[in-house]
Amino acid sequence: MPPPEDPEDYVAPAAQRVRAGTLLLANTDLLEPTFRRSVIYIVEHNDGGTLGVVLNRPSDTAVYNVLPQWTTLAAKPKTMFIGGPVKRDAALCLATLRVGADPQGAPGLRHVDGRVVMVDLDADPDAIAPLVEGVRIFAGYSGWTIGQLEGEIERDDWIVLSALPSDVLVGPRSDLWGQVLRRQPLPLSLLATHPIDISRN
């Protein structure tokens, strides 16, 4: 009988996998509070470094209190999400395009990957509304310098996986970390059974 497969067998080297539109899932051993069980969507990955936003950290601050003009388009729960520890006083917005929508020529939209776009918060929400299913606004972001993320991946801090457009707008009551793992092949999907409270393990 062959030896059991290791979850790392499904994680390609960082240089082959990390790109705009991929997800970083915090590994079960990453217990630092800022990133524990976090799911990070990569917005940029190039020679200047890597930028992403945490998809599963809602705050208690309503979008209406910060950017009221975007309240209608904001996906539920219509709160600001904590994108990461860098520049918490700056806002970054992602949106999922409607199926079949053509963003070409639309002011204020920049393609990231698939149906996911970055939204210029100075743009007119009414002009963007027909094109998107919703927007998610993040306070701050997560950033890595050149080579830093690759080192963390080699240290097994992160699992690099493909994203679905719906991941960007997932609600706060959903366990996005577990959802992403459960849609992976065995044995990686088994990590989804890892208890939220490690004292129960």
Curated annotation (Swiss-Prot):
SUPFAM superfamilies reported in the protein's UniProt record: VC0467-like
GO-annotated cellular components: cytosol
Pfam families per record: DUF179
InterPro entries found in the cross-reference section: AlgH-like (IPR003774)
Family the UniProt entry places it in: Belongs to the UPF0301 (AlgH) family.
NCBIfam families given in the database record: PRK00228.2-1, PRK00228.2-4
Protein name (record): UPF0301 protein MAP_0045
Lineage: Bacteria, Bacillati, Actinomycetota, Actinomycetes, Mycobacteriales
